[in-house]
Amino acid sequence: MGSKTKGCCGWLIVALVASLVATAAVVAIMKKKVGGGSGRKLKPLPVPGPPGAIDSKYGDALGVALQFFQVQKAGKLENNQIPWRGDSALDDGKPAGLDLSKGMYDAGDHIKFSFPMAFTATVLSWSILEYGDQMSATKQLDPALDALRWITDFLVNAHPSDNVFYIQVGDPDLDHNCWERPETMSEKRPLTQINTKSPGSDVAAEAAAAMASASIVFKSRDTTYSDSLLQHAQKLFTFADTYKGLASDTYPKLQNYYNSTGYQDELLWAASWLYHATGDQTYLSYVTVENGKAFADWGRPTWFSWDDKLAGTQVLLSRLNFFGSKQTSNAENMGLKMYRDTAEAVICGLLPDSPSATASRTGGGLVWISGWNSLQHATNAAFLAVVYSDYMLTSQTAAVQCSGKYYSPTDIRNFAISQANYILGDNPMKLSYLVGYGSSYPQQVHHRGASIPADAKTGCKGFQYLHSTSPNPNVAMGALVGGPFQNDTFVDSRDNAVQTESSTYNSGTLVGLLSGLVTTSSVAQSFT
């Protein structure tokens, strides 16, 4: 777990400008698609139907990846399938009269950070909404739904009143001074909340996005629960938008762990999901008109991550431009077009032979942005790419234009495949970075529970297991480790947290990526 920055990506700015200029130059030969858009219809494309033949490679990897959510669960476990895990954190929330025992530990430690946990839930919901059929075809939908609800149950309980939300359980400094199994931890676990006097718009808005998106997932499965999630989402969004401020400004110690660099992207992200969940035009106007102009940074897109939601928002809102949105005003349509133009520029920057391709890659072809948790950005980018390619297929949009060159949905999907294949072992190290998949994967994942024998009595000071050079006695199935350095190398050492620590938010988009690659199929034109 480490801090990161949003940072603007110069290649993306160049890509966007080039894309907009080129689009204007050839507008006469561009054919309008459903809901508008700028894809050139070179020839009719078949719209794929329901999932067909399953690619077992990605289906098997999906089954492995989803197990990590079981590994990370806190609380009283139900139908536990991880033999070395047991109940933990049962008293979380009790000082405030709350049950905060559920939720998930964010990475290799035992803190519950609501910010990345909520992001995990949001992208997991998005993955289910886009690729639930693929998950069902591989018998992985129920595990995905179970993981999602385990998080949203926590988020609901962490929101006991309109303007109060608990953003953290545990003391990170104290936790990091211990190396122990979650089942035996005994140190104090204080609660941290945001409220009207101690705001945290970034965390509150991300929680709103999580519960709004999850409300759509559960709408046909549990109406009462779905309605409850939506009510919490709406109240949290109002709270976040009314009492603005960063949680890491309110609580400076957070800057050492999850240092959010802005809350505007979360507000747009949350409002976008609330529009999809409710159809309320107020939310669409929020993201496309005044607040879109103020917060969306059209022309300055960034990498999708737990910190920065703009690229995800751009792709999510582009589906409205691909498939149409009911009763939109001219101003709203213009805003949606700007989101799609920006999303298209992001896609152009990802394609390796595009004129505007980013040079931020390893020699092995992995998109590489940061040394810490390097696979995060590659996984997130590949997820957005496969989603965007499926929007194109479903809307029969034949190509995107990148500085005068055209790229088909297959080209975009091939980029996503390249990143997935790298993760699964097609890389210079010949190593699967998904623990439990393939014949060779990291053996010393930086993970407390996995590194300590289930019957060990360590107390807080089990650091001999951190520094041991032996393989973990317990396999953290489904963990996506941090990943390689820019030279494609990887040091499998438990002390090397930069490369060997895993996180739930990486797993959220990995599940979506693998689900999208299980088989090519059309996506629903509406979530509801």
From Swiss-Prot:
Its EC number is 3.2.1.4. The active site is at D109 (nucleophile), H446, D492, E501. One of its GO terms (biological process) is cellulose catabolic process. One of its GO terms (molecular function) is cellulase activity. It comes from Oryza sativa subsp. japonica. GO terms for cellular component: extracellular region. The keyword Glycoprotein applies. Keywords: Carbohydrate metabolism, Cell wall biogenesis/degradation, Cellulose degradation, Glycoprotein, Glycosidase, Hydrolase, Polysaccharide degradation, Secreted, Signal. Glycans are attached at N259, N487. This is Endoglucanase 24. Belongs to the glycosyl hydrolase 9 (cellulase E) family.
